Amino acid sequence: MKVAVLPGDGIGPEVTEAALKVLRALDEAEGLGLAYEVFPFGGAAIDAFGEPFPEPTRKGVEEAEAVLLGSVGGPKWDGLPRKIRPETGLLSLRKSQDLFANLRPAKVFPGLERLSPLKEEIARGVDVLIVRELTGGIYFGEPRGMSEAEAWNTERYSKPEVERVARV
């Protein structure tokens, strides 16, 4: 299986390297046949190519069967125009690969309730899975804009977008 590795920015390279250690050990133990290729993405790609999701990375992602993605963005690129900020690469990746849902688990394990910011009796037994839609709504809504006196954005979902994420 071909895996495109996009370390990204900030702590992303460190996290993806740790994930690769785990995947390599799993591959060695189970013979999964994983092959990795690293591509610049986000701020690192802006530094190398002038854009957050350059063509070599796009091609590598399209040819891969899986993507291992680190974090994206950081203060270094905050002053860039919106169209070339690291986060725009993330939105382009989601759109190009039709990655429309994100699963965000939140679970408090027994014995760790006291470490939660919630009261222990409230935190006890929490086990929630949040399904987050990634390619519609506020991310890609039009019209959007900003002037000296105001800013605006549009959050719109089509019925098929809602039905699709509801099936996740």
Give, region by region, the residue ranges found by the protein language model.
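N-terminal basic/disordered segments at the start of proteins
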Residues: 5-21
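Anion-binding alpha/beta catalytic cores of soluble intermediary-metabolism enzymes, centered on
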Residues: 1-10, 28, 35, 40-168
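Short catalytic helix/loop segments, enriched in acidic residues and glycine
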Residues: 20-30
